[in-house]
UniProtKB/Swiss-Prot annotation:
UniProt-recorded name of the protein: Erythronate-4-phosphate dehydrogenase
PANTHER family: 2-HYDROXYACID DEHYDROGENASE YGL185C-RELATED, 2-HYDROXYACID DEHYDROGENASE-RELATED
Molecular function as annotated in GO: 4-phosphoerythronate dehydrogenase activity; glyoxylate reductase (NADPH) activity; hydroxypyruvate reductase [NAD(P)H] activity; NAD binding; protein dimerization activity
Binding residues annotated for NAD(+), in chain numbering: 147, 176, 238, 263
A Pfam family the protein falls into: 2-Hacid_dh
Principal location listed in the UniProt entry: cytoplasm
Subcellular location: Cytoplasm
Length: 391
């Protein structure tokens, strides 16, 4: 049995190596020839599974993507060919939500506001959007949800129109797949008209899919904003419309920019790999399930003891102990600027940052000790490991 794996799937070679012969290759450059005599294909979102890719796949029986998103896979084609497909829904939800919180905490510090005074608009109430809402609930931060598909399916949560989101929310964060068809397409959902309707001083975050945001419209709006000719707008992009190619005129206008790593926490990547591995084991009728937590190293972060009830400053410090978006932003800008004028080098640099991404951890890696009156229960709901001090 031969299993072809994206080289950027952590722990995959070791796990799948227990089941057969493993071949690893860069996911973005996979070709039809690579799939000859391959029984199973394990990928991430950079690999487009379409007719061209599997045209020579003479033995392929199983395709797994270690990502929450599925829009890079032609599932109808796989079904037509009798090839089993699986994904890893929700594997990265914690990392993406923590990315958004880090961005907002830092922007709040820079612009002089408290995140607790803002209303957040969440577009897309799937795994990521729902988990972010759960985090905001833990902190008591108001938010509005928008997901017309979930609403039509009978989801009983309170949903709001895009018009309400634009009119009432200070922050809008997008967590949708990319779709061009159907009643509610998301391609260029964030377009010129959408941006024009935002509140003054709005903050826009896209950590979903690049083409959800019309990058040219966003660039125009940010240029007007920063020249004083338009409404003040702050934008954070983890994804770009034509990645791994990045518009270097847009880049300096962004508050923060990163190379599609919002969900790249070590726990999330381990979850994605183990979810796909476990489903492949089930496909093979092998009882060999693995827990993601069993693969993780001890986190190199300090434990924290609270001496008083936490406040904005405490929360900021705790969040930055785990993830400070400024670190990734600075490295990304340096790597992109030095490739100016060379599209091939830019694409390589973009992918290398993802391939060699540092071992970012989730809030659960920090143990916070404090008395009940110090608000530790809220930190526990946010994801931190909490020990109540009963002394």
């Amino acid at each position: 049995m031969k299993i072809l794996i994206d080289e950027n799937m952590p722990y995959a070679a070791e796990l799948f190596g227990q089941l057969g012969e493993v071949v690893t290759k860069p996911g973005r450059t996979l070709s039809a020839d690579d799939l000859i005599d391959i029984d199973a294909l394990m990928i991430r979102s950079v690999t487009k599974v379409n007719h061209n890719l599997i045209s020579k796949a003479n033995k392929l029986q199983f395709v797994g993507t270690a990502t929450a998103g599925q829009d890079h896979v032609d599932q109808a084609l796989l079904a037509e060919r009798g090839i089993t497909f699986t994904s890893a829904p929700g594997c990265n939800k914690v990392g993406v939500a923590e990315y958004v919180l880090s961005a907002l905490m830092v922007i709040g510090q820079q612009q002089g506001f408290s995140i607790f005074d803002k209303t957040i608009g969440i577009i897309g109430a799937g795994n990521v959007g729902s988990y972010l809402a759960q985090c905001l609930d833990a902190l008591g931060i108001p938010y509005l949800l928008n997901d017309p598909i979930k609403e039509q399916e009978g989801d009983t949560r309170q949903f709001h129109s895009l018009e309400a989101i634009k009119a009432q929310c200070d922050v809008i964060t997008v967590h949708t797949p990319i779709t061009k068809d159907g009643e509610y397409p998301t391609h260029h959902l964030i377009n010129e008209a959408f941006i024009d309707a935002l509140q003054p001083d709005a903050i826009l975050i896209n950590a979903a899919r690049g083409p959800v945001t019309d990058n040219q419209a966003l660039k125009k709006a940010l240029q007007l904003s920063q020249s004083g000719l338009g409404k003040k707008l702050t934008a954070v992009l983890d994804v770009f419309e034509f990645e791994p190619h990045v518009d270097l005129e847009l880049l300096p206008l962004l508050a923060f920019a990163t190379p599609h790593i919002a969900g790249y926490g070590l726990e999330g990547k381990a979850r994605g790999t183990t979810m796909v591995f476990n489903r492949y084991c089930a496909f093979l009728n092998i009882d060999q399930a693995v827990e993601a937590s069993s693969l993780l190293p001890i986190a190199p972060v300090p434990n924290v003891s609270l001496s008083r009830k936490w406040d904005d400053a405490t929360l900021f410090s705790l969040i930055q102990l785990i993830y400070d978006i400024r670190k990734d932003d600075a490295l990304f800008r340096r790597n992109m600027v030095v490739t100016k004028g060379n599209e091939a080098q830019m694409a390589t640099a973009f992918d290398q940052m993802r391939k060699n991404y540092w071992d970012r951890r989730e809030y659960s890696a920090i143990t916070v000790t404090g008395k009940v009156g110090f608000g530790v229960e809220s930190l526990a709901k946010l994801g931190f490991t909490v020990v109540e001090d009963i002394q």
